[in-house]
Every structure is written in structure tokens, then in C-alpha cells.
Amino acid sequence: MPRKGPAPKRPLINDPVYGSPLVTQLVNKILLDGKKSTAERIVYEALEQAREKTGTDPVVTLKRALDNVKPALEVRSRRVGGATYQVPVEVRPGRSTTLALRWLVTFSRQRREKTMVERLANELLDASNGLGAAVKRREDTHKMAEANKAFAHYRW
């Protein structure tokens, strides 16, 4: 294991079209096989579709979707005397954003629409309205934490 501690966080460059670091993070989550220009095209077209359907700024829609998907609690496995407990812990802000983006992209890929642009746009719109699979994942995560509240004293 390295002894110098964790690598320093690299600053996120604001995205050139919307000037938002969240859009940059979304592009990086969509990215497959190093094809960044393809990922950017998918994200920008999806945000444009979201703008056409809602008539509002797509970055606002993205932020609203993220706020509806970000988990406040999650469970972590903790081994105590031969038994493994699911211990509920609070999620740090950076991790909650990362999880929300990951869930949005994962569930966009599982949707049935024809193109990835449509899938991502519709998942974003659903999430911003409090619907969709990504929001359900957040609710399930919170339910797990609530169900295991008895083990909260094992937090570290």
C-alpha cells in the first residue's frame, strides 16, 4: 500500500458548452472506450432534448434530477465477531453526487428507448420529476439504511 496517503483530487474543468462541472462529470460517466467526443455528443444532445421538452435550462433540470437521486444514507458491511452487519452511514457530498450520476447513467443504459440520447434525456426528466429507476434505487438504499438502523452504533 502507498504510504503517501490518497492522491490529491484533480480539479474538474468546467464544460465548454454549459460551463458546469456537473456536465463534465456526466460526460466522464457516459464515457466508454475513451470515446470522449461521442460521450459529449450524447450528453449535449440529451440536454438539448430535455430543454425542448421542459422549456427550462437543462443544467437546472440536471441539478434537480441529481437532488432527487442523491442518497443521504447508505449501508456498509462491518464485520464484528464473525458476523457481518450492514451498518448505515451518512454519504459524503462528493460520493452522493458520484453515486447519483452513476445510477442515472446505469439506468439510462437499461431503458428501452432506441438511442442513448433519448434514454439519457428521458431518465433525466423522470428523475427531475421524482420518477424513474434511479430515484427508486435511492429509495431502496434509504430503506436498507432504515431497516438496519439497529446496527448504527457499529459506525466507524
Swiss-Prot record:
UniProt keyword annotations, A-Z = Ribonucleoprotein, Ribosomal protein, RNA-binding, rRNA-binding, tRNA-binding
One of the protein's GO biological processes? translation
Q: Which domain of life is it from?
A: Bacteria
Q: List the disulfide bonds.
A: none
Q: Which CDD domains match?
A: uS7_Bacteria (cd14869)
GO cellular component term, pick one: small ribosomal subunit
Question: What PROSITE patterns does the annotation carry?
Answer: RIBOSOMAL_S7 (PS00052)
- Could you tell me which Pfam families the record lists for this protein? Ribosomal_S7
Entries under InterPro entries matching the protein: Ribosomal_uS7 (IPR000235), Ribosomal_uS7_bac/org-type (IPR005717), Ribosomal_uS7_CS (IPR020606), Ribosomal_uS7_dom (IPR023798), Ribosomal_uS7_dom_sf (IPR036823)
* GO molecular function annotation: rRNA binding; structural constituent of ribosome; tRNA binding
**SUPFAM superfamilies registered for this protein in UniProt:** Ribosomal protein S7
Output the Gene3D superfamilies linked to this UniProt entry: Ribosomal protein S7 domain (1.10.455.10)
Q: Which family, according to the similarity comment? A: Belongs to the universal ribosomal protein uS7 family.
Q: How does it assemble?
A: Part of the 30S ribosomal subunit. Contacts proteins S9 and S11.
Q: Function, please?
A: One of the primary rRNA binding proteins, it binds directly to 16S rRNA where it nucleates assembly of the head domain of the 30S subunit. Is located at the subunit interface close to the decoding center, probably blocks exit of the E-site tRNA.
Identify this protein by name: Small ribosomal subunit protein uS7
Organism of origin is Rhodococcus jostii (strain RHA1)
